Amino acid sequence: MMTRLMSFLLLAGCPSLASQAVNPKSSDTPALQVSTSQLKNSRFHIVLDYHYNLGLSQRIGSQTQGRNETYRMGGNSLHLTAMYDFTEKFSAGAGIGADRYTNSDFNTFPVYAAFRYRPLSRIPAAYVYTNAGYGLFKSVNIYAGWMGDLGIGYQYMLRKHFGLNFQLGYNLKEFAGIESYAYDPSTGQTTFLGKKSAVRHSVSFGFGLVF
């Protein structure tokens, strides 16, 4: 009787032992899947970008000045942006910048919203982007005004939270509240004419770091 009981228990336990031998780490699989998913879905990034803005033209009041040999408009900007990937194709965020435009010289500190869209599934690192914002601060040599960007970019991630960012686009910037004066050489008097706004159009070349 005892021999028959032992034989029955051995036969009943064999399928369970065989199942564990085939897949000994089955209980660990869900944890591994979660870890892999979290690694792939790192959705939040900080981007620090430098841009050189090659000025094409500028309008002040009713006068428009194009780029030429003696009037070489330029500019440098440093932008810090927080981006979040809502989907595999769409990202949005917000940022703040410190911009210096030259010839004529203007300083501005814009706060802006940033949007990216990745239309190519075969090249997920490539995207189109647009930014829209406003320069909040205004004082001597610092001007408020609207700003906007539109262009293409490429973000190459070397690690989970470190990569390179490249952008090429169009930059539109308004400088509001520019004081205008008229000088009369015959009398030596200067007359205040009021305040005007300048609008500059530029090609923007950008390089940055992604964290």
Please identify what each model-predicted range represents.
Residues Q63-R67, P110, G145-D149, Y181-Q189:
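Flexible, surface-exposed loop regions and adjacent strand-edge segments
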Residues S37-Q58:
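Transmembrane beta-strand segments of Gram-negative outer membrane beta-barrel proteins
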Residues I60-S62, F106, A176-S180:
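Outer-membrane beta-barrel and related beta-rich outer-membrane complex signature
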Residues P30, G61-G66, G133-L136, S186-F192:
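Extracytoplasmic loops and strand-loop junctions of Gram-negative outer membrane beta-barrel proteins
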Residues S197-F211:
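Outer-membrane beta-barrel "beta-signal"
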Residues Y50-L56, N76-G151, Y156-L164, L209:
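Gram-negative (and chloroplast) outer-membrane scaffold detector with strong preference
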